[in-house]
Amino acid sequence: MGTIDTTGILAKHAIKIAEELCSPAIIVSGDFDLAGIETNIPIYYVPRRQKSIIDNLISDSLEDEKRLKSILEPMAREATGNTQHIEQAAAIEHIIGELRTGTIVGLIQTRESGAIVTHEVSQSPLIRTIQECEERVDPEVMRVALAIAFDIAASGREGHKIGTAFILGDTEEVLQRSHQMILNPYAGHKDEHRNLLDKKNWESVKEFALLDGVFVISEEGIVQAAGRYLDVDAKDIDIEQGLGGRHVSAAAITRDTFAIAVTISESGGTVRIYMDGKELLCLDYIERPSLQK
């Protein structure tokens, strides 16, 4: 009896499901080769997650029930982890503007199993967080700030990892509760050269992200200042232990004003969103998926 081509069967069914759903993309995690399958739907490949349930298998000496549990629990964790990996990749591509909303189809393979999953992009925690901030900051400004944050998290600047923060909205209050550490590089420039909605201005933001301090950005996306120091009382701010002063002060300014803060950690490139002094979302850096040509 011949060997069943499980990956090939899964791949063909994933394509069929995606076409029936009019999916904006198929996102693949694992050793699937879809090069020979014709479809007009964009196919993205995300890097494989490192941990596999085979690393969690135990010796035969344990009781069967415990042994089964020790296999099933890691399998459930891995399935959840791989699904979240695909969902996060889809959300980031949507934020960056490479992926429209809709139901994406994910194709997952590990050394032990394979699966097809579907995910509605608009229901992503990241997208819902942006919607939660809509009353305070224009959603497009929020999207652009996150796109720049992901870019900084991924590539840094001139080979160096960068940590910075964007304080969005309630500009007048934020400026009153902060001061310049250096000469404001945006002072005196026309709005058109400070507008984040114009992609031509993103490079200057990434350049000035090397400066100490934070960016202050209006709810309409106009950069008011860079290299700004926040004068806040960090007392009673409850954030993850081990985070530095930039994260503490960014969280504190959102407690004291109606601003939203987006932070990028220098170590690891983790992107966080704060509102009302609390962390709304934490996204660990993941390598962006590659588009199949």
Locations of the language-model features?
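Divalent-cation
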Residues: G2-A252, A261-K293
